[in-house]
Amino acid sequence: MSIETYRQKIADLFAELDAVMSTDGGYKLSLSDTQKFSVAIGKRVLDKELVSNGKIPVYSANVTAPFGFIDKLLITDFSVPSVLWGIDGDWMTSYLPSDMPFYPTDHCGVLRCKTSEVNPRYLAHLLEVEGGKMGFSRSYRASIDRVQGITFTVPDISIQNNAMSKVADYEMAIKELEGSLEKIASRRSEIIRKALAE
């Protein structure tokens, strides 16, 4: 299968979850519920604090790729997954599994589940969708107060977990295909370079 086919399968799974919600109802949750969610933002990181051989990725408004690397932690407990969102850039979210240390800047929000009612990977999707509906953008910042104002409904956790297990499989297949494409591109460049050198 192609990368686009896997991406479509992921989109289809999220659409199926949305369909379950509209027919079977579900559980209503609010990100303002501090018993079920923790919502925080990071701290400012100056360029001079970044280190080329740092081990901890630093996430800023672009939460899909590290801004740089650092050798200190702001958060010390990584036993649970994290959902990141960009506060004042283009609206985007990302999911980081547990045991993956990172450092959020003051342009990056961190959302964590304290409840077993919602799958954290699914929560990243829900946050992205709901933030899009609210119009979060560079000009309409996704502040903590605004994010905590988000409410959503989720299907039974077993349905979420089943779908997110498939999403994880598809995402792994995409990474493997992207790795193969990078190797092919590198090999092609090497062949062209050798041919031009002759």
Where are the predicted features?
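Non-catalytic DNA-recognition/assembly elements of restriction-modification systems
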Residues: 1-64, 156-198
